[in-house]
Amino acid sequence: MVVHYVGNPGTTAAANRSFFANLALTHETYASAHFVVGLEGEILQCVPLTEIAYCSNSANDYTVSIEVCHPDDTGKFDDATMESLEQLVAWLCETFDLDPAKDVIRHYDVTGKICPKYYVENEDAWLTFREDVSARIEEDNAASGETN
């Protein structure tokens, strides 16, 4: 699973989904993502999980891509966005039996591109995010009586 940040600060999830939909019609370039997480925590699916999204270069055919909206040039996600991102990533990890510590990566980890910017520039924050996803999975499993 690859986490990205959108290249246009302050835009909505709906605007980014529309951008991808327009590219599919114009064939101007190949760019898409499976999901976009918005500034208010909304999660929009753009591409079915059974199809390839063009977002992660050489990793496109075996990853799920998530674009994340952010309010400004720092690239830091706000609280509502982070809550939904954690929820989505935890659900995807549970669905596909993935380990957040190994299987959740940044676009940077595939290509070296500074994306998602805040989590490339703040490695500790990235590690904390993955730990938070693991904790959410454990909480979900405890609530449902499952064990890993």
What spans do the regions from the language model cover?
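Basic/polar, cationic surfaces and motifs that engage anionic cell-wall
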Residues: 71-148
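Active-site-adjacent loop/helix surface patches within enzyme catalytic domains
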Residues: 1-98
